[in-house]
């Protein structure tokens, strides 16, 4: 005969049943809570976490906003630079959620090959032809931003330089049909910012839920509108060019709309998405270098003397070359100052992102499992054994390096080195660095010859830290006044 079950036993059994059913949910929730807390720590202190990790080991794990990664010391840069088992494209796609609708503009594949090939074979080779048009755009854009007032007045370099870079880049990327269109310029600037914001918003969600969440997050939905707006603005330009070239097959345009078509050679691609990807990859990083260099120069104790040296270099070089490519090569003090600013404040303390497509064994016998995401630390740029007095801004540092070396390219802004990873290393290094270097030098020529500049009263610029990223102080202010340039630019 069965004994009746007591109320206490029933409750205990029910509770046990509930626990069994809910335990996977509770485990998942507790796990995600732990991950969420780690992500919050990274967002606030990612910079310090990398430095702390390197003090303990040359290889360590780091929970980032977009999940776990392995960080390597700078000494590993050479051995992973071109390792075929480590994928750059897979890493980029993962970081930017390219598998999710709305982020598919960042999907790697044949279109990305077209983009990379265009930058290397067309943009870089056309820099000499682009210098004069870029200078013209700089004159047209700088004047309304900084004015012709001979009195000291305040400007915000963060917003004004960003707009100037967007204008110059668009002149080379999309031609004069859209490069002066305020809506297009605003779109190219805002698309980058909002893409990062949307990607970061998704990063806080569990990976499996992200495709669903992206359908409702306002920041993600905004990306669809950018793509549609860009499509609406570009379609008339593309159609007009098709009609013009149908009438005159020899008609050509010196910009990436034309160059993408030539490079593709029949391969499928979306010209609108390629333009957005190009803007995403170039405008903000180039502007950040210009802004940081100006802030560093103005903060230098010997700024007056340094400014005279820079101006003399620009004037003598311009009188010899005009707006021709050799001019840029002769601006050696400027080149050194730019590279020093990039050394002191890179855009991130880590770089060279990769995903292991198969297990990889490092030189110290560490095994990197398949599927692992890797980053390489940039901290060699602050190593006193490599750069004496590394925390001091020395605008002549790389000029001395060039003068002391038998290799003329040593220490140039665009040169690559495992001790200076701002542009990466190896075949996957930034292909647009030559164009970016030309842009920033053209802009600095105009600014230094046309304006007296100094930091606004009380302004002490300090880079903004966000995770492992470093951004030139967006709150910094300058005082500027128009001066008469010694040569007509």
UniProtKB/Swiss-Prot annotation:
Entry-linked CDD domains: CYP503A1-like
Q: Which organism is it from?
A: Aspergillus terreus (strain NIH 2624 / FGSC A1156)
Name assigned to this protein: Cytochrome P450 monooxygenase trt6
Transmembrane segment boundaries: 10-30
Say which family it is in.
Belongs to the cytochrome P450 family.
Q: What does this protein do?
A: Cytochrome P450 monooxygenase; part of the gene cluster that mediates the biosynthesis of terretonin, a fungal meroterpenoid that acts as a mycotoxin. The first step of the pathway is the synthesis of 3,5-dimethylorsellinic acid (DMOA) by the polyketide synthase trt4. DMOA is then prenylated into farnesyl-DMOA by the polyprenyl transferase trt2. Methylation by the methyltransferase trt5 then leads to farnesyl-DMOA methyl ester which is further subject to epoxidation by the FAD-dependent monooxygenase trt8 to yield epoxyfarnesyl-DMOA methyl ester.
The consequence of inactivating this gene is:
Impairs the synthesis of terretonin but accumulates terrenoid.
Write the Enzyme Commission number(s) for this entry. 1.-.-.-
Q: Which residues are glycosylated?
A: 364, 407
| Protein's gene | trt6
Q: Which lineage? A: Eukaryota, Fungi, Dikarya, Ascomycota, Pezizomycotina
Could you give a single Gene Ontology term from the biological process aspect?
terpenoid biosynthetic process
> Could you tell me the membrane topology recorded for this protein?
Single-pass membrane protein
Give, as in the UniProt entry, the pathway in which the protein acts.
Secondary metabolite biosynthesis; terpenoid biosynthesis
Q: Is this entry keyworded Cell inner membrane?
A: no
Which residues are noted in the entry as heme-binding? 430
Name one matching Pfam family. Answer: p450
GO CC term (a single one): membrane
Superkingdom of this protein's organism? Eukaryota
Q: Where in the cell is it found?
A: Membrane
Gene3D superfamilies registered for this protein in UniProt? Cytochrome P450 (1.10.630.10)
Cofactor(s) the record lists: heme
One of the record's GO molecular function terms? oxidoreductase activity, acting on paired donors, with incorporation or reduction of molecular oxygen
Q: Which UniProt keywords apply?
A: Glycoprotein, Heme, Iron, Membrane, Metal-binding, Monooxygenase, Oxidoreductase, Transmembrane, Transmembrane helix
